[in-house]
């Protein structure tokens, strides 16, 4: 707080809070409150305390914020329904551009599960959209999988290793 005052800056009290975060936050939180340490949201990510895969050392982990995840899924679903009449090849090509953009922003360390879940939901929405186009040309799930082999969707990938 003193540092902010030095530069004539103020925090909005209703939007700010102090939380215990760091190496000993998990142990202290379990001892004091009997639960996991608090998390915070920033720039579409939820930051939480975790441990590294190879060692038991403290590690800051990020995952896609639940609210942003739902908003992005809803926007993608609406986009698919708006563009359901374009040819499949073009639809998948444009959808891949959107998917890669999502992966590039949210593809950070420890977030592969969330971007994988995003792809899973997008695949289901695409299946529904393609089956709404015409009852004569609707896909079975096996036919849809074959179509995805011909026009594959972009796979999730970690683009930035933060920690």
What are these model-derived regions, one by one?
Residues 1-163:
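Non-catalytic terminal/accessory segments
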């Amino acid at each position: 707080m003193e540092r902010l005052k030095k530069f004539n800056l103020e925090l909005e009290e209703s939007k700010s809070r102090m939380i215990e975060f760091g190496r000993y936050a998990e142990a202290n939180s379990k001892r004091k409150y009997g639960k996991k340490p608090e998390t915070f949201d920033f720039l579409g990510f939820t930051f939480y305390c975790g441990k590294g895969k190879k060692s038991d050392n403290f590690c800051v982990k990020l995952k896609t914020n639940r609210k942003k995840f739902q908003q992005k899924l809803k926007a993608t679903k609406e986009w698919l329904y708006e563009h359901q009449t374009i040819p499949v090849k073009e639809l998948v090509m444009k959808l891949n551009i959107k998917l890669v953009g999502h992966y590039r922003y949210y593809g950070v360390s420890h977030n592969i599960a969330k971007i994988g879940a995003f792809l899973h939901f997008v695949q289901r929405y695409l299946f529904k959209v393609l089956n709404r186009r015409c009852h004569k040309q609707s896909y079975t799930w096996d036919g849809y999988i074959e179509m995805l082999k011909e026009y594959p969707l972009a796979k999730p990938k970690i683009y930035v290793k933060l920690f």
